[in-house]
Amino acid sequence: MLFLLAGFEINPQTITGREGKRGLKTWLATLALAFTLVMSLYHASFGELSIDALALAIALTTTAIGALMPILKERGIFTRKTGESVLAYGMWGELGPVIAMALLLSTRAPWITVIILFTFITLAVLVAVLGQRAAKAEHQIFLVLSRGRNTTSQTFVRVTMFLLIGLVAISAIFDLDIVLGAFAAGFILRYIVPENDHVLEEKLNAIGYGFLIPLFFVVSGAKIEVTAVLNQPLLLIGFIAMLLLVRAVPIFIALHTDKTPEVKALGWRNQVTVSLYCTTALPLIVAVTSVAVSAGAMSSSLASVLVSAGALTVLVMPLLALLTYQESKDSSHQ
């Protein structure tokens, strides 16, 4: 549900526009930096890296954009330039690691995974386009669903749940991370639901942020081995430091060297703010470490430390970002 809401909130132009493309290049740079760092830690070449090393490198490039959405909205940053930059850079920290997981942590041949990924993405785009056309043409099926959306039938909510479960199931069947299916469901909804229609969004927010998303964090926390974390405090701090080095520093450099007037107008403090927000990472760390633990390549104690570090970033990074944020230099896009 966390990733469905993230996909639903994102305007495709945000990640395909100029700053979005810069965000992609920056994420690729963070990926290269992460692998360089991990290879030096493991004293191995790229081809010699084990699954746990690959998982660690991917985890260093993640951004918990779904967890950041409500924070940005509550602080009034979501509709401002700072929020737009967080989405442009942070969204690739959500999408990129999912694709990297599929390609690098899969037991299949890479070319087979590429074909499956391409097929899945094509299917999602096709459903989105057909759904959008049906909505614009006021097709009979869409009209029936519209009439029941605010009644006890709650047709839009039911279709959303069906879409979410269906795409997550397809992802699982083809051994793709279920995050991809959930995000695709949000992407499809974005195209089908009219832009100014916030009724469904409010209902999904109530279901997600009121129950399912807190449940996800509770379950993630319940899996943490507290003794393992307490016994390895330096590893915990070290991983957070690596996240800052790999994720925050490249994003700050990309923003600081951007010559666009709007980005330059943010000032270095708001550029630091964007970088700190984008270093918030938990959900995909849970996903990456789960794959490595299931494969027997990572111990549950190490996974617990990494997940705990991710949880700390969700608490600490937004707090630090609040301290560096300068509203007077942040233009509104509302």
Spans of model-derived segments:
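Juxtamembrane and boundary regions of transmembrane helices in multi-pass small-molecule transporters
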Residues: A44, I112-Q140, L255-L266, A309-Q334
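Entry/N-cap segments of selected transmembrane alpha helices
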Residues: I10-F46, I51-A57, P110-L126, I224-D258, ...
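C-terminal ends of transmembrane helices
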Residues: L4-E19, G66-T79, V129-L143, I188-E202, ...
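Hydrophobic alpha-helical transmembrane segments in multi-pass integral membrane proteins
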Residues: F35-H43, E94-R108, F162-L176, L215-L230, ...
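Structural signal for the N-terminal portions of transmembrane helices
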Residues: M1, G23, V86-G90, T107-T122, ...
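Short helical (or helix-break) motifs at transmembrane helix termini and adjacent helical loops
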Residues: E9, L33-V38, I58-S85, M91-I99, ...
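Membrane-interface junctions of multi-pass transporters
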Residues: M1-R22, Q140-F239
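Membrane-interface alpha-helices at helix entry/exit sites of multi-pass transporters
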Residues: E19, F78-W92, I115-I116, H198-E201, ...
